[in-house]
Amino acid sequence: EIILGREAEKPPVFYRQKERKHTNLLMPELSETTDCVEKYLQGRGIHPVIIRYCLDNKLLFESADYHNAMFVGYDKDGKARYGALRSTVSSYKGELTGSDKHFSFFLEGKPNAEHIHVFESAIDLLSFATLALLAGRDWKSETYLSLAGVFQTKRENVVPVALSRFLDEHPSVCKIHLHLDNDAVGRGAVKGIVGGLQGKYQVYDEPPAHGKDVNDELKIRVGLMRERKERERT
């Protein structure tokens, strides 16, 4: 579904975090292997080729202490500025100390891209890339951005800081594909982004066709998960 703004003359309304002194991202000691992270992500349906790409490009790491998966985002100078943590053995989620959400996890495709695909989490991002790979598309030519989570807010027309920063630094982007969750928070975030951008971009609302999020859709596609209605009938 495409949502076209009507007021292109108005500038986008970006909600920015309060100015704060830049702090360094504190990276923990790394594991000598990435076996736990690779096993965990493959169990979520992520293709090994995409996992290896992220490892080789220092976008994905495994911590030595708890063997958490770490998804790292960089600024335009190549400095690590954000780290999302995901346990490989529990439901724990967190962020590295010193993380700045302006620089959340992303995969950049061809230079001067016109399209960007936007997700709530790094795992949803990698799930979409996997679906593209399985469909025979050139997944590395696309540009993908994780918002590092979306939240309910009392403010209207809020553009997440990760997206506003990315758009500022990539003026070639004119089409935004939102692949946010099929829940109240995800739907509210779509509404806020569309309102906040004020018609400056073509925004496409493209939630997962199956399941709550893009990873659910991937797991259903590859047989790792059944849709809720199918489970209820069994």
Identify the meaning behind each predicted range.
Residues 3-4, 185:
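Charged interaction scaffolds used for protein-protein
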Residues 123-124, 189:
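Acidic, divalent-metal-coordinating active-site segment for phosphoryl/phosphodiester hydrolysis
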Residues 9-10:
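Accessory, often N-terminal, substrate/partner-engagement and coupling regions
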Residues 41, 71, 78, 120, ...:
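Terminal peptide-recognition signature
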Residues 118-123, 149-152:
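Conserved mixed alpha/beta catalytic, RNA-binding, or beta-rich assembly cores of soluble enzyme
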Residues 13-104, 108-110:
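Basic, glycine-enriched DNA-binding surface that flanks or lies within the catalytic cores of DNA
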Residues 130-234:
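TOPRIM fold recognition
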Residues 112-117, 175-176:
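Short active-site oxyanion
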